[in-house]
């Protein structure tokens, strides 16, 4: 069926306004922070952006979708993709979150593998490292987070352990990939073996490679255990936060900015509001409860009849749990806990939007929603 189009009125365009100019060596691209649950990815994202764009909690698996935070500098624009923690899934939700991370790896320019300074490297870290190098040709920067939680000797030991992890997993896997590539080249009659393009070269970043359908060779490293680099950071004390952003920016392609100046995230307001309500509900929640909480925004509109200089935004959300017993925990005696959740969330929403908010939270039960495909689809997973 033919569609009707409204012609563009060129008279409304200000063609005299000068276009913004950027240095020839300006860089712009995507960096994904990956790691185990509760590795400090969201806290670091917020610190680099300079504003809260991702909710944080000491509960593992707080992040449930990829969140983009945008870092603006004179020399570069870095779009940070904060991902859910990679873990051994126990539910369909867990499987979908891992799939979400896997899909992200091929769409960014550089990976930041977050490893807490205060936790020994374990099987989960080895698994993630092997997945990163096996499924992506992108440079991987090892970021040792939570440096403020250990002393200098303990931090030095963790940095050495991270370097050893790179030697054990990253370098070994890269060597195997190079062997396989050489074998494929021989089978093709020696036609391969040319230097593949990398995100370091202009016009040869991930987007260009995807258009060409190419898979480039493993990225060069600086000798630190197979990592592109290793750097410690404390997002809480803002120790080396800018240094991490500067380091990651070195691996994104030459490009003008991809987002307007001043834009700190491309997340819809409804998504941010739902996340702030969930964050408030996670505080003080019992051990089994955090994973059972999901939040959706059902309605959001300014109340009619309010004065223009004193608007009020009505926000209605549904907070889902999996069992009736959990519903009563969320509500609390006489609704006391729900009021605390609402007050905490409303204050954060008002600070984010810059307007007064009336927040209505309706608690519902969606039985075993984490393993129900239809429920997951309704909740946006």
Predicted regions and their residues:
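P-loop NTPase nucleotide-binding/switch module
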Residues: 2-31, 167-168, 172, 176, ...
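Conserved, well-folded catalytic cores of nucleic-acid-processing
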Residues: 51, 70-74, 104-111, 131, ...
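Interdomain boundary/hinge elements
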Residues: 176, 228, 255-269, 358-360
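Conserved G1/Walker A P-loop phosphate-binding module
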Residues: 2-110, 115
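P-loop NTP-binding site
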Residues: 266-381
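Conserved C-terminal guanine-recognition region of P-loop GTPase G domains, centered on the G4
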Residues: 72-77, 96-228, 302-309
């Amino acid at each position: 069926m033919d569609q009707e189009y409204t012609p563009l009125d060129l008279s409304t365009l200000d063609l005299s306004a000068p276009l913004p100019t950027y240095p020839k060596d300006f860089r712009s691209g995507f960096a994904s922070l990956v790691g185990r649950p509760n590795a400090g990815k969201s806290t670091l994202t917020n610190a680099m952006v300079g504003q809260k764009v991702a909710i944080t909690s000491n509960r593992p698996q707080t992040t449930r979708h990829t969140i983009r935070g945008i870092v603006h500098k004179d020399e570069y624009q870095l779009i940070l993709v904060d991902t859910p923690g990679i873990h051994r899934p126990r539910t369909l939700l867990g499987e979908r979150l891992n799939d979400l991370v896997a899909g992200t790896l091929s769409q960014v320019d550089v990976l930041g593998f977050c490893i807490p300074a205060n936790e020994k490297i374990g099987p989960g870290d080895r698994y993630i490292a092997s997945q990163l190098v096996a499924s992506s040709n992108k440079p991987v920067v090892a970021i040792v987070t939570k440096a403020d939680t250990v002393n200098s000797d303990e931090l030095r030991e963790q940095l050495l352990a991270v370097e050893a992890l790179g030697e054990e997993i990253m370098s070994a896997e890269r060597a195997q990939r190079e062997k396989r590539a050489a074998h494929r080249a021989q089978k093709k009659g020696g036609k391969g073996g040319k230097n593949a393009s990398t995100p370091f070269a202009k016009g040869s970043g991930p987007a260009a490679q995807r258009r060409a359908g190419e898979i480039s060779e493993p990225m060069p490293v600086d000798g630190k255990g197979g990592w592109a680099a290793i750097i410690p950071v404390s997002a809480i004390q803002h120790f080396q936060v800018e240094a991490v952003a500067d380091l990651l920016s070195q691996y994104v392609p030459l490009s003008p900015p991809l987002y307007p100046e001043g834009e700190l995230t491309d997340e819809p307001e409804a998504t941010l509001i739902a996340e702030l309500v969930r964050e408030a509900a996670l505080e003080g929640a019992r051990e089994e409860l955090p994973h059972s909480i999901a939040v959706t925004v059902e309605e959001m509109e300014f109340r009619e009849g309010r004065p223009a200089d004193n608007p009020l935004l009505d926000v209605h959300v549904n907070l889902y749990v999996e069992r009736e017993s959990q519903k009563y925990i969320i509500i609390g005696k006489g609704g006391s806990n729900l009021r605390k959740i609402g007050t905490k969330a409303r204050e954060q929403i008002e600070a984010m939007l810059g307007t007064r908010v009336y927040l209505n939270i309706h608690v519902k039960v969606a039985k075993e929603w984490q393993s129900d495909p239809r429920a997951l689809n309704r909740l946006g997973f």
